[in-house]
Amino acid sequence: MKKLVTIKSLDHPLAQYLKDDPVRPDIPHDVRVSANSTVFALQDEEKVSAMVCVKYQDQIPSNLDELMDEPKHPTVAVFYTIWSYMAGAGRDMILETRKWIEDNNPEITEFVTYSPKTEMARKFHLKNGASTYRENEDSVNYKY
């Protein structure tokens, strides 16, 4: 049975998995659990199958500085890194996390990514129902 876990502190036992982030390892772990940020883990039985880091913003970020802003009234959930340990878990992670945010944060009305400009990211997001919103200098925003 799959279970979505929210991680809001580096003291959480699942925070240890942040070291495995292959997409944005340079973002400090404490930033990922700050006021406008949440890390989510998808567990299948007791095994972690996927992780995603989400930043809540008041705009769709086009660069890392905009992603790191701390707005007072966020309306956009930005999925900025996702990785999985099991085939197919990334898709489940995105869908489960979006549902959780919709149910728990009604002020969040847009769901986008801040993705690297890679073919793997493009295929992943388009295959899972996103559309290309904007291509930036060093990233792409996909909209769910």
Give the location of each predicted region.
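Non-catalytic substrate-recognition and accessory regions of acyl/acetyltransferase enzymes
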Residues: M1-P74, W83, P106-V112, D138-Y144
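Hydrophobic transmembrane signal anchors and adjacent membrane-proximal interface regions, especially
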Residues: K3-I7, L95, T132
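Short secondary-structure junctions
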Residues: H29, G129-N136
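Acyl-donor binding region in acyl/amide transferases
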Residues: D65-G129
